[in-house]
């Protein structure tokens, strides 16, 4: 009986020891709580953009405040004498410093066409006749060229008998201008450019010394203000 009692005590002691061991194991293996998340609900504020609305100024313009817009000459209308050919026009202009590249429109037809050349000996009589017949001429001043005056004639009277009789009386010929439009270019391309009025006047004075050129008109980029219109 004593032996049996000892066995039971050993069994109970073993069970108690095993229970303690189990409890110790449970406590020592309790998992670390990693379920608490890192608070990432407050995002980094990336919604504030970098201010790129103010561009870098790479287009610093050349100040044109001293340039009068009405002095920018974009082209010229050149009035050549009757019979001047296109090749003669080109050859003539090549002899002058045109300042800028240009494009030629030969024989432009939107200008007065007809004229007479009156020598100084007959100019008084012819002018007297033309003043009586005011519809015979265009309201354009006569151009003095050497020993002659160039008078622009209205197309309405070129078949008028009295006008033809006057031509015969003073041995005059009715002739046609050859007009050429010049457009200055920025380069060799089609863009219209301009030259200064100062250069245009210099060029006009030089060209009008040519025996084949009567007069030159300017075509302004911004036409001068005319209070009468």
UniProtKB/Swiss-Prot annotation:
Protein name listed in UniProt: UPF0228 protein MA_3119
Family note: Belongs to the UPF0228 family.
Organism: Methanosarcina acetivorans (strain ATCC 35395 / DSM 2834 / JCM 12185 / C2A)
InterPro entries tied to this protein: DUF963, UPF0228
Highest rank taxon of the organism: Archaea
Pfam families: DUF963, UPF0228
Positions of the UniProt region annotated as Disordered: 35-67
Compositionally biased tracts (Low complexity): 35-66
